[in-house]
């Protein structure tokens, strides 16, 4: 996820103890024993020079598309790449939902709850593994990485159940990320991290945990040293052969119905959507390769979601421009995005389009509504008087579009956590509408199928109390030879059905085009 944190480098003396709760370039047994007395999750690290590796080559060597692995990257404002890329090379377990209750896949941490409400189990797991932040580590060194589906909101709000659950996705799945490689683009290094999680604290158990972590580091180091077959490939850009869930006429009927609801005072804005499906033999990694070139965004991700037997259930490939919420050191931040123009062909055209967007009263009114919604969401979990709006309604340029963006921040209340901030903001107002609950009720009346991943979030909660979640848009779910992409847009009183249909199709196009192009990759 957002990978811009500027962490200072540490001593390069192997085995030396840095000041406080910090780690040197390599974790010694003595360092580990000292940290194990105070921490439930202890990272064992090894920093290696890897200036000839790319995030993709490192991912291919360390993760190789195995179930339970991931790749997270970030391109700031769709242009320059951020400092860090993160590769999840191993996850012994995942917290998910089965039979409407929390369940662990794989080997759960000792003492972790199972059964009951999934959010309660998640909260208890984060509390069980809570660990003081350690200086000198990359922004993501351990935690739970995965997704919340849009339909997780049914555990937060009472909604009608009218849409068909045809994909049967779990409401959430979060990988226990124990083995991580953090690629530092500034230094040309990779920090390999093997976490020891929740042992009983005896000397024998601590030594075993250290030896096990070092063995995993050895495996990762050896894998990085292996040569790869060439990743050079030719490709073409065919038009995607996809199926839309609804025709323009059917979608226009939905828009007209919602406009009537808005005129009747039911809501100010509602965000309907529709799904696009595409048969494909493309590798999810190849889709990611194309997408990161054609549509670089602040949140780029590839996750391979395991099933109950340890096989691959589905993959998530996305390039999202928008965060739901981030929490860092007790400060929660959300970035409402509303108001869009396509990028111009020249700088002069971009400037003219920016002026047009800033002068559009309708776009500015919708943006203000979502900023107010963000303030209200954070106000539920932040200390009174700390919620504020910064950089109100400024332009941010991305690879293909520009948006009106604001920043809303607040200090978490003492009795609130990063998970509380996520649930307070969930789902995003930009994907539901305002007032949020009534808008979701109206969405349930008009959409045929449950949204699943679309409008949910992809990201992580770490064990030091931080979180970073992107809204799951510009995202494909790939399962058993079919890719599912969903898109929509905000409907207000003067919305036009054919325009909204075209707008949804345009938003889905970047991902559909990437899938079509990925299927043509071939060795030259």
Swiss-Prot record:
Residues annotated for L-tryptophan binding in this entry: 74, 298-300
Enzyme Commission numbers on file: 4.1.3.27
Activity regulation, free text: Feedback inhibited by tryptophan.
Cofactor(s) the protein requires to work: Mg(2+)
Ranges where the record places region Disordered: 1-25
Catalysed reaction equations from the record: chorismate + L-glutamine = anthranilate + pyruvate + L-glutamate + H(+)
Entry's cofactor comment: Binds 1 Mg(2+) ion per subunit.
Record field: compositional bias (Polar residues): 1-16
Binding of chorismate, residues: 339-340, 454, 474, 488-490
Molecular function via GO: anthranilate synthase activity; metal ion binding
GO biological process terms held by the UniProt record: L-tryptophan biosynthetic process
Keywords per UniProt: Amino-acid biosynthesis, Aromatic amino acid biosynthesis, Isopeptide bond, Lyase, Magnesium, Metal-binding, Tryptophan biosynthesis, Ubl conjugation
Entry similarity comment: Belongs to the anthranilate synthase component I family.
Keyword Metal-binding: yes
Pathways per UniProt: Amino-acid biosynthesis; L-tryptophan biosynthesis; L-tryptophan from chorismate: step 1/5
PANTHER family associated with the record: AMINOBENZOATE/ANTHRANILATE SYNTHASE (PTHR11236), ANTHRANILATE SYNTHASE COMPONENT 1 (PTHR11236:SF46)
Protein name (database record): Anthranilate synthase component 1
InterPro entries associated with the record: ADC_synthase (IPR005801), Anth_synth_I-like (IPR019999), Anth_synth_I_N (IPR006805), Anth_synth_I_PabB (IPR005256), Chorismate_C (IPR015890)
Residues that coordinate or bind Mg(2+): 366, 503
NCBIfam families recorded: PRK13571.1, trpE_most
